[in-house]
């Protein structure tokens, strides 16, 4: 962020032990530095405690928040009507997607498990699809042959097509970015868009300058 926006100043940092957050003291310390906004990466039970405490103190929605993962159904189902409006988040608006790949995946997932998919469901499915595609391309399960086959490999995900970049073997599978809102007493994502990974990954020149040449042998 500092590289893109040198004017941004981080006025404080809090690193609560995962699963053991003291939301009150964490927020007290954070707000003592008078931030214009908060960048959050807590999740699970820690996120629920932080949101509840912040709502009670009127920190949210008064102070803008950018939060990773918080738009995922795994966490919105826990937050319920405490979901903080206006947070900018990454997530998974599963009930609003209308692309063919996702419609088929979601319908089959519900039929199999009698529940709606979560982000973990999507990642697991996409991982298996990539493995299947790699084995098919390599026509082998040999490790080295699979490594070679997966460079530039294209595969299908519920979010749409993705690939492993040949230059650094990174997946281009992206993420949904939007804002949180409450509808029917439940948290949901609004004003969302799909951020395709290939549009945000480092340039070839950047990768070559930092990645050992023998890593691609």
Question: Predicted segment positions?
Answer:
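Extracytosolic ligand-binding ectodomains
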Residues: 1-217
């Amino acid at each position: 962020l500092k590289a893109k926006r040198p004017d941004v100043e981080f006025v404080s940092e809090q690193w609560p032990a995962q699963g053991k957050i003291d939301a009150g003291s964490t927020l007290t310390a954070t707000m003592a530095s008078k931030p214009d906004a908060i960048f959050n990466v807590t999740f699970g039970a820690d996120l629920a405690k932080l949101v509840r405490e912040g709502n009670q103190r009127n920190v949210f929605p008064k102070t803008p928040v950018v939060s990773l993962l918080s738009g995922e159904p795994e966490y919105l189902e826990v937050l319920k009507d405490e979901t903080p409006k206006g947070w900018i988040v990454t997530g998974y608006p599963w009930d609003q997607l209308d692309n063919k790949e996702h419609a088929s995946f979601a319908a089959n997932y519900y039929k199999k498990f009698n529940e709606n998919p979560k982000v973990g469901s999507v990642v697991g499915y996409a991982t298996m699809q990539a493995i299947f595609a790699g084995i098919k391309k390599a026509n082998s399960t040999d490790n080295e042959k699979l490594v070679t086959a997966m460079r530039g490999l294209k595969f299908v995900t519920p979010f749409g097509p993705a690939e492993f970049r040949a230059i650094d073997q990174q997946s281009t599978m992206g993420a949904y970015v939007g804002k949180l809102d409450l509808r029917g007493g439940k948290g949901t994502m609004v004003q969302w868009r799909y951020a395709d990974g290939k549009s945000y990954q480092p340039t070839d020149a950047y990768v070559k300058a930092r990645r050992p040449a023998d890593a691609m042998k």
